[in-house]
Design a protein with these regions (language model features):
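Glycine- and other small-residue-rich loops at beta-strand/loop junctions that grip anionic moieties
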Residues: 25, 107-108, 133-134, 220, ...
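Boundary-proximal intrinsically disordered activation/regulatory segments immediately upstream
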Residues: 1-53, 136-137
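Active-site/ligand-binding-proximal alpha/beta "capping" segment
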Residues: 175-223
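Generic beta-sheet signal
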Residues: 49, 68-69, 88, 133, ...
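Glycine/small-residue-rich loop that forms an oxyanion/phosphate-binding "nest" at active or ligand-binding sites
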Residues: 65-90
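Structured adenosyl-cofactor binding patch, chiefly the S-adenosyl-L-methionine
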Residues: 87, 123-125, 136-153, 205-243
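RNA substrate-binding interface of SAM-dependent RNA methyltransferases
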Residues: 38, 96-179
């Protein structure tokens, strides 16, 4: 059963200021909690239904566990439907950026759903790190974690000033624009940085100054634009096939 203090903490961690204050974040739903545990991430506490505990006993064994009924879990979860498990995980120190291979950098991508999907896409294509500009969405937002479908546990997120990073980088910097060289005709290097811009404004002018390989996804129909997560997947697919 959830105590009042536990309920209060779970609700508080839906907000960025309390995640930062406590150094904790929420992982919700059976799939995401399983991925969290499989990755060996630091966990403070797990709240779970009897069915989830029975199905994941070995994974849960080392952790502090609170048995809850499904109604309790649904009541405190930020998800529309979650009656299996919620974990309180500990925020880890930011990883060191590795620029020896392909790096994906997001310039002010502010929509949590898009960011979560991009993390999932990056995981699909084998990227172990993503760089976020300082004004991109919080990658520990519950909506982001949920949208990753477990990929948050395998992809490190590094938040930094993109202009500073790009100004000292000595490899190709690809940027997605409405105009540029077609991704189908670009010979991608195995080492490089791909910059994707925000949903509403694209790549900022300050960041664009550091891009030396502007690229575009050619359109064959009448749609005005592509969702940034969809566009990221298309470009990464071309980079992996031609790089």
């Amino acid at each position: 059963m959830l105590s009042k203090n536990q309920q209060k903490l779970l609700r508080a961690l839906a907000q960025k200021k309390y995640r930062k204050q406590h150094g904790l974040y929420l992982v919700q739903g059976a799939k995401n909690v399983q991925e969290l545990l499989n990755a060996g991430k630091p966990v403070k506490q797990i709240f779970a239904s009897a069915d989830f505990i029975a199905a994941n006993r070995a994974l849960l064994e080392p952790h502090e566990l609170v048995l809850c009924d499904e109604a309790e879990l649904s009541k405190v979860s930020t998800l529309v439907s979650n009656n299996a498990a919620i974990a309180i995980a500990e925020t880890e120190p930011q990883a060191e950026l590795n620029t020896s291979g392909l790096v994906l950098a997001l310039d002010d991508v502010s929509d949590p759903g898009n960011l979560g999907t991009i993390i999932r896409v990056a995981d699909w294509y084998g990227l172990r790190q993503i760089v976020l500009s300082e004004h991109s969405a919080d990658h520990l937002n519950p909506k982001v974690i949920s949208a990753t479908m477990g990929s948050f546990a395998r992809v490190d997120v590094i938040r930094t000033d993109l202009c500073t990073l790009l100004s000292t980088y000595d490899g190709p910097v690809y940027g997605a624009f409405l105009e540029g060289q077609s991704v189908h005709a670009t010979s991608f290097a195995t080492r490089g940085i791909l910059v994707m811009g925000s949903e509403s404004h694209g790549i900022s002018a300050a960041v664009a100054e550091h891009i030396n390989q502007p690229i575009t996804i050619p359109a064959f129909g009448g749609a005005e634009s592509l969702n940034v997560a969809m566009a990221t997947g298309i470009i990464l697919d071309n980079m992996k096939r031609h790089g």
